[in-house]
Amino acid sequence: MRKYFPEADTQLSEAVLRLAVALDLPALQIRIGSLLEEAVSRPYEVALYPVPNWKLKSGYLVDQALLLSIVRQESIFNERARSRRGARGLMQLMPRTATFIDGEQRYHRNGNADLLYEPQLNVELGQRYL
């Protein structure tokens, strides 16, 4: 899809955007929204500021808009984002920090750091850290 998208017309792009919203794919929404905004010179807020349907175990302890703005800034909603220093996931948590927040799970040992790529877990730990 990424291969063909740059050549897509506006109607097709808007259809793909609606599909990305329906399938809860916020990173794709932002990418399409940015390209559409450039193509037609008008903002696509629904795409540029997505509201994913994440079910957090403890609910939202921090304002949802604040959390989503941090996720947008840190990872652009890329669940597999990883910094050069080793921060992982949507909120760019370091494995040792996640271990400190959780208190039980050891994210910095035995390959457990990859658990931080799971969106709900990453956002849950991130909001607890805030």
Predicted ranges, named:
Residues 1-130:
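Catalytic glycan-binding domains that act on GlcNAc-containing polysaccharides
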